[in-house]
Amino acid sequence: MSEFLPFSRPALGDAELAAVGDVLRSGWITTGPKCAQLEQAFCQLTGNRHAIAVSSATGGMHVTLMALGLGPGDEVITPSLTWVSTLNMICLLGAEPIMIDVDRDTLMVTPALIEAAITPRTRAIVPVHYAGAPADIDAIRALGERYGIPVIEDAAHAAGTAYKGRHVGAAGTAIFSFHAIKNMTCAEGGMVVTDDDALAQRIRSLKFHGLAVDAFDRTMQGRAPQAEVITPGYKYNLADINAAIALVQLEKLTQHNARRAALAQRYLHGLADTPFLPLVPPAWEHHHAWHLFIIRVDERWCGIDRDGLMQALKECGIGTGLHFRAAHTQRYYRERFPDMVLPATEWNSVRMCSLPLFPSMNDDDVERVITALRAIAKV
């Protein structure tokens, strides 16, 4: 049997090892100069005035929503078809998640679905840039401006994604992930970008205990200003060990995303005459980062359901992923919102399957997956 082909594998090499070694030898391994360099480099990528490195996108979402002043009685609009961390953070702040449906084929929230969910208690809108493609952010931001509601972009899938010629997050506020399977990784980490000066200052404080300065600031500036708590905060700072890896990954991002795109095109060509349905690219101008390659598996057409397909591929030595099981179908949210019905989300949630996609895959790996899928579907 062939070697197991995982759903994802981080693209790490000698440059990342050397970067970590440099940090270890420097004597400064926590938040420091590498983190500052990463923030500057990310500002150059997205064009934002501020980039705040955090220990995870989840932590970044937490302190960003907290910096907006979210609390009991407030509502946040976001899709159910997302990773549960966003919903969890909303609930942990005492606010109410208002989960909405998505377009059935792009899996993006739409301005119409968002507007229908707005109430006098809406305090934030969190659209998701899904699988490497961007949501229609101009239209969504226009809604936010019309109603006076901040838009916080979930860009966890969108490092390298462009919308109408500009990187996702440009001129707004967005949160990126550097988790192990993302297009750029440092094992765990994330970045908040924003052009809002006051919001950036609050996020910087909240991600480090609520202090006005961190340990590196105090080393560079001495004891003035004093490390004084402005408001109770958390510890979501990113260590220089992680930042050093992320800096190397950022340098490789364009090359890695180009390889992802080439692999995705091979999938699209090889599966074009099969019953497996890929996602439909958004109609607006964009550059796809191809974080995920997703197919939808309908038993009526494929002769097998999604779970059966994933098991059959596993028996062929091929790994798969699920992005995502709808949040409102999970026990806590199902019990909290028992009457919630989101037809397009639910249809996709039980049919979607993420195929292997990572830069070090070769063309034969893709052909192996396509051959297995065609054999399973008997086409």
UniProtKB/Swiss-Prot annotation:
It is an enzyme of class 2 (transferase). Keywords: Aminotransferase, Antibiotic resistance, Lipid A biosynthesis, Lipid biosynthesis, Lipid metabolism, Lipopolysaccharide biosynthesis, Pyridoxal phosphate, Transferase. Its EC number is 2.6.1.87. It comes from the Bacteria. Gene3D superfamilies: Aspartate Aminotransferase, domain 1, Type I PLP-dependent aspartate aminotransferase-like (Major domain). One of its GO terms (cellular component) is membrane. Pfam families: DegT_DnrJ_EryC1. NCBIfam families: PRK11658.1. This is UDP-4-amino-4-deoxy-L-arabinose--oxoglutarate aminotransferase. It comes from Sodalis glossinidius (strain morsitans).
